[in-house]
């Protein structure tokens, strides 16, 4: 058998599919990141080793700002190419919805690099609007205001507009339009109004219900006519500058996008026919990320189109509708937060230990005093072959169930139960090996891989770092960041360190379909073994929660230049004291309470003075230490 090669690992984990030229494997068998076009690589294993020397421990989130820059340029260049090809005579605007990742360093990097592309921001709530207005005071780029609005939200936006901000209040419900008109009159400002339209068209994938008739937001055709009538009566026709639609995040099928664009383009045409000279069409989000690298509409974790195709369809549809009706081309706004940010962050954590189902030693021989069920199951194991494996499997299951029942009634002892257990799993493993080589294996054997997988216990919280994996079964690219020049010899599911049975990952990317286990390597003594989770830059940080009081992980910002990479910033993860403070425990008060208890215990002779000091020292240091295992 030939030696395992790097190319085999590339195929096994499909890194060339989802890596989008940013991720690969080097000759050392380590995952590398190439944030820029100039080809400068960052070896993730060497980066983690360097960070360990700096006392920055895993789990850690590694951010690559250069990838953010590259994503902005890529989308902007796609718009430029499509504009030239289709004779587009208006402007396009890239808008970053900060709900995707509100972390200040991420937003600031996007603003900084996006200035030359006039990149704008979107706020979907009052707190987000406060951030958006203050973080980019010098720019005349667009600010889109979505979400539910009250008087203070609207007043803040209108006063910002009065001071020169290009800010658009997008009406989600009719009552908002009345409120905007009222506040605008009080403040003596002509508001820039947008209206979100509820299209009949919907997206595809996990967020399909975000669009169409089931959409939470937007005005129906009847409500739109009511809004237009209201604006006309209030002498505010000129204030309607923008129409907006959104058919859902991570749209998997380009056909759904084309359908929605055709429908939206007719709303734009009809408004112009009615005398409302709308200038902007905000096509919302939906531009998906190919998480599994299959480029398939059949997968909820993939898309069957490129950024260029998405942009081409957006521009060509609106240009065609405008030209046919003799109206100006609209300025096109796209809110593609997921596509901008997903690739720039990598979560890295260490495997702490493993657990494997028991199996019988190969040299085991049944003894005269062993229970008859042990004899029967041993015979099945000893004579197992392909021709009778289905019958053998059924017999093994029956024997196991009978043994468990007898144990529960006190008829067989613990030793017998353990023997049955080891023999049963040995039979199961052999049947799985035989079935995996068959072209058409019986259905009942298809889940044996999942059943037999090892458990790799990892130092991270699924709920804090990968909430979408738990909540909506989102599949992220996951693979070891080292030893990729070695053939994986185990298959495992990943378990986090929360006290929750849901804290596990059991769905992974494979070359053809979703796999229920991940190919990994056996641990080598005390050598650290790291797993990387990729494309986690969208939503995961901000949606994460503190289940079991595990806080934010360490975060590291890494940039590259011609000389290599540099660690620009290290943001310490949350301490135990910080997360306790969130849930209204005062760390200082906790220490004082324990000091009183320890003093009392010393006086009662339960512990010595030295033991009391040691206990308090450990408690204090633990309070101000990392929430994860160190």
Curated annotation (Swiss-Prot):
The modification N6-(pyridoxal phosphate)lysine is found at residue 99. Its cofactor is Mg(2+); pyridoxal 5'-phosphate. Keywords: Decarboxylase, Lyase, Magnesium, Metal-binding, Polyamine biosynthesis, Pyridoxal phosphate, Spermidine biosynthesis. It is an enzyme of class 4 (lyase). The keyword Magnesium applies. Substrate binds at residues 281-291. InterPro entries: Ala_racemase/Decarboxylase_C (IPR009006), Arg_decarb_HB (IPR040634), Arg_decarbox_C (IPR041128), Arg_decrbxlase (IPR002985), De-COase2_CS (IPR022657), De-COase2_N (IPR022644), De-COase2_pyr-phos_BS (IPR022653), Orn/DAP/Arg_de-COase (IPR000183). Signal peptide: none annotated. It catalyses: L-arginine + H(+) = agmatine + CO2. Catalyzes the biosynthesis of agmatine from arginine. NCBIfam families: PRK05354.1, speA. This is Biosynthetic arginine decarboxylase. It comes from Phocaeicola vulgatus (strain ATCC 8482 / DSM 1447 / JCM 5826 / CCUG 4940 / NBRC 14291 / NCTC 11154). The lineage of its organism: Bacteria, Pseudomonadati, Bacteroidota, Bacteroidia, Bacteroidales.
């Amino acid at each position: 058998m030939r030696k395992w090669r790097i190319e085999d690992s590339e195929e096994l984990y499909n890194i060339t599919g989802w890596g989008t030229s940013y991720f690969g494997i080097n000759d050392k068998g380590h995952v590398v990141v190439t944030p820029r076009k100039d080809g400068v690589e960052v070896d993730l294993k060497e980066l983690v080793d360097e960070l360990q020397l700096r006392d920055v421990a895993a789990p850690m989130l590694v951010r690559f700002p250069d990838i953010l820059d590259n994503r902005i340029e890529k989308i902007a260049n796609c718009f430029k190419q499509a504009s030239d090809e289709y004779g587009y005579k208006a402007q396009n605007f890239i808008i970053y919805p900060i709900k995707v990742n509100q972390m200040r360093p991420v937003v600031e990097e996007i603003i900084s690099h996006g200035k030359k592309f006039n990149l704008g921001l979107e706020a979907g709530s009052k707190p987000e609007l406060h951030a958006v207005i203050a973080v980019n005071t010098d720019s005349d780029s667009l600010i889109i205001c979505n979400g539910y609005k009250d008087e203070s939200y609207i007043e803040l936006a209108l006063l910002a507009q009065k001071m020169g901000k290009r800010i658009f209040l997008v009406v989600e419900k009719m009552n908002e339009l009345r409120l905007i008109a009222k506040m605008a009159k009080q403040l003596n400002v002509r508001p820039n109004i947008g209206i979100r339209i509820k299209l009949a068209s919907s997206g595809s994938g996990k967020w399909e219900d975000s669009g169409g008739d089931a959409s939470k937001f937007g005005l129906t055709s009847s409500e739109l006519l009511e809004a237009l009538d209201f604006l006309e009566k209030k002498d505010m026709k000129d204030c309607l500058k923008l129409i907006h639609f959104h058919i859902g995040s991570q749209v998997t099928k380009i056909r759904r996008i084309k359908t929605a664009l055709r429908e939206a383009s007719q709303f734009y045409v009809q408004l112009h026919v009615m005398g409302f000279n709308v200038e902007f069409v905000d096509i919302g989000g939906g531009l998906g990320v190919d998480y599994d690298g299959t480029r398939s509409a059949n997968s909820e974790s993939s898309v069957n189109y490129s950024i260029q195709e998405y942009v081409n369809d957006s521009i060509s549809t609106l240009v065609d509708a405008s030209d046919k009706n003799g109206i100006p081309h609209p300025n096109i706004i796209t809110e593609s937060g997921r596509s901008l940010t997903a690739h720039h962050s990598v979560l890295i954590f260490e495997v702490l230990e493993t657990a494997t189902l028991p199996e019988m030693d190969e040299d085991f021989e049944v003894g005269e005093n062993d229970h008859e069920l042990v004899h029967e199951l041993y015979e099945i194991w000893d004579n197992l072959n392909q021709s009778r494996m289905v019958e053998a499997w059924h017999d093994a299951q029956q024997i196991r169930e009978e043994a468990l029942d007898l144990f529960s009634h006190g008829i067989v002892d613990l030793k017998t139960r353990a023997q049955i257990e080891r023999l049963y799993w040995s039979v199961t493993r052999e049947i799985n090996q035989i079935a995996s080589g068959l072209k058409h294996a019986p259905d009942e054997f298809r889940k044996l891989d999942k059943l037999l997988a090892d458990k790799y216990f990892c130092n991270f919280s699924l709920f804090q770092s990968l909430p979408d994996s738990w909540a909506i079964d989102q599949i992220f690219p996951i693979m070891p960041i080292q030893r990729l020049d070695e053939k994986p010899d185990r298959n495992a599911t990943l378990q986090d360190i929360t006290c929750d049975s849901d804290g596990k990952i059991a769905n992974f990317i494979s070359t053809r379909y979703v796999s229920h286990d991940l190919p990994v390597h056996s641990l080598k003594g005390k050598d650290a073994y790291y797993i990387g989770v990729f494309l986690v830059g969208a939503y995961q940080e901000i949606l994460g929660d503190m289940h079991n009081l595990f806080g934010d992980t360490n975060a590291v910002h890494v940039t590259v230049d011609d000389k290599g990479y540099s660690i620009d910033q290290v943001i310490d993860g949350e301490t135990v004291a910080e997360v306790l403070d969130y849930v209204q425990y005062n760390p200082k008060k906790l220490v004082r309470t324990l000091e009183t208890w320890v003093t009392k215990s010393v006086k009662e002779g339960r512990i010595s003075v030295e033991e009391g000091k040691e206990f308090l020292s450990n408690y204090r240091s633990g309070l101000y230490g990392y929430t994860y295992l160190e």
